[in-house]
Amino acid sequence: MSSFSQVRNPITGQATWQENADDYDYHQEVANAGFGDMLHDWERNQKYYAAIKKTIKRMQADGREVHVLDIGTGTGILSMMALKAGADSVTACEAFLPMANCAAKIMTANGADKIQLIRKRSTEIQIGVDMARRANLLVAELLDTELIGEGAIGIYNHAHQELLTKDALCIPARARCYAQVATSSLAKQWNGFKLMANLDGETLLRVPPQLNECKGDAALHDLQLSQLPTESFRLFSKPVEIFEFDFQQHLEPIQKQRNKVVPLQASQPGSADMVFYWWDIDLDHESEIVLSCAPFWAHPDKDKHVAGEDKPLANAIPWRDHWMQAIYYIPKPLHLSNTKETFYLSCHHDEYSLWFDAQLKEPAESIERHHCTCDLHLINPRSRIGQLNQSPRNKRYLNYLEETTTKDSQFLVLGNSCFLGLATCGLGAASVEIYDSNSLSRRLLDSFIKFNKLENVSLLEKLEDVQDHSKLTHIFAEPYFINSILPWDNFYFGTLLLSLKDKLSEGTQISPCAARIFALPMEFLDLHKIRAPVGNCEGFDLSLFDEMVKDSADKAVSSVEAQPLWEYPGRALAQPQEILRVDFANFNQELHQQGSIELIRSKECNGIALWVDWQLYSSESPKAFVTSGPSQPIEIGKFVKWDMFVRQGVHFPQTRTTNATQVEWQIDFKPFLGELNFKFDLKSI
């Protein structure tokens, strides 16, 4: 049997009915559940196991039976650890049924049938109905990058009230959250909007007051903080502990809301713009087994790990992608005039999230969670906001626009939040029409139009509202569309051009005129682990989990996924190769290309990076191209420097080999269907 679901194709812009097997949603959920990279986190696994062994041994030495509850068991790995460590009984619960069913098979395969598996949320479990007794040892992994974003507070409070004995121990036993105040001209680009100037430095677009007054979005910006270039930020304080969460609750339940004011002394003058955030956990009651999520410069074990040419210092500490670090942007940057100047960091959390502020005077009351009031943060992801502020990128566009714009130019601009389109007004264009289908984006652009008193520009909700196609001299796009995820999703620009083609004058200039997709074989240090099979984990066979994930990924996951590759170091194994060129003047042509890339560096190829170069005009000069890929020339065998304000595509080969000599590739592009299909094979020749 099959079912149909309505999906929007990003390239055609059309909502179509897609036929799926009845279990498609199941496979999609399994493939994207994200258990895999946790199981590749060797430090997490080893320390959890060590804490389980130690705690059970201690409880038994005290003459206590050990009855374990594992909340959110996943593969069942923690339950099997507890059983093997000698627990008298183990109860595991898992509400995600595909994972629960897989866990049952894994437990059987590992001789752990004694574990009682409950296919419910822990908050639905009843003593005497689902469990024979209260547990006196809770093992769980309920945390995320924010620590509390997955509901850990409520789950722990309920467990202690309903499912655990009063003297129960927990693994982990407690957590501590840390903050470090910083400034970064690079990271600030993800949070605001800079004025736009021409190549001579003259202002083209001034920023409306509502953007400068907006406090931004309080939500965390999660990222691999260790990969932020050290020269791109300055620290105003040492890391400070801001909150502790006692999961064992021997004194009282975890509070759902708290605020704390931390006095700090500035280590240097400057503008305090943001808070770097992370946490650590004590896995055992005595705080002897600690797991830290700190960035490399603040990591307690950084001196124990050896850095070298093959693994930089930023990657010498244990890698994980499920628990990263985060940036919280301070609502109003605080100017610190002097070294050792005292200021106050206000820290707040509710049941699911945190937020921060910084002030020169100690605040008398709690500060409410702030939110966006200017639309910029509501409609644009962090990467897009950064892209809007990216000076080298904007200069490429402005160079083209300055050279081609005259007093007779009449522009049609296509895309969402295209401020470069507004800038053409300041360059002297006779008229500018901007087609932007998103109402919030149009409202944001309109605020710039009014504040800058632009009179020769109009915003269009529908493409049919263009006044006179025959008078258009230029069609321009970056291109960027809100629904795009992968770089080539912005080929929607070509679809829009097709609808205009018969109405345009012959001499209408189109920019970009073409797009080129490039492929680069990579040896990633860690990124490939998110799709790599686990096999054996701490002595437990998890191959059934690998089979389940592979089967679901084959059915429901695209062969290429979007990732911000600057966060995931990897070496180039060859020079990049152009695998597809799309001419927007002939966008209706179906294309099929194939070829091979010779691997110059003989290492494991565990990923293929993909990106788009946009050709602004007909020239092979580097100035004619805007890339979404590497930001510096590729050196084979060296780490690739990636554009930090866009996600690239990446394909993970299903077969792993260390002796591949080339990558064979095929690509098929069907513009009317909005299909772009890739196929890659590693070959040893």
Swiss-Prot record:
Root EC class: transferase
Keywords, comma-separated and alphabetical: Methyltransferase, Repeat, S-adenosyl-L-methionine, Transferase
GO MF assignments: histone methyltransferase activity; protein-arginine omega-N symmetric methyltransferase activity
UniProt xrefs under PROSITE patterns: SAM_MT_PRMT
Top-level taxon of the source organism: Eukaryota
Cross-referenced Gene3D superfamilies: Hnrnp arginine n-methyltransferase1, Vaccinia Virus protein VP39
Residues annotated as transmembrane: none
UniProt keyword S-adenosyl-L-methionine, yes or no: yes
SUPFAM superfamilies: S-adenosyl-L-methionine-dependent methyltransferases
S-adenosyl-L-methionine in keyword set: yes
GO BP field: peptidyl-arginine methylation
Ranges where the SAM-dependent MTase PRMT-type domain occurs: 14-355, 364-685
EC id: 2.1.1.-
Function according to Swiss-Prot or TrEMBL: Essential arginine methyltransferase that can both catalyze the formation of omega-N monomethylarginine (MMA) and symmetrical dimethylarginine (sDMA). Specifically mediates the symmetrical dimethylation of arginine residues in the small nuclear ribonucleoproteins SmD1 and SmD3.
Family: Belongs to the class I-like SAM-binding methyltransferase superfamily. Protein arginine N-methyltransferase family. PRMT7 subfamily.
Name of the molecule in the record: Protein arginine N-methyltransferase 7
Gene name linked to the record: Art7
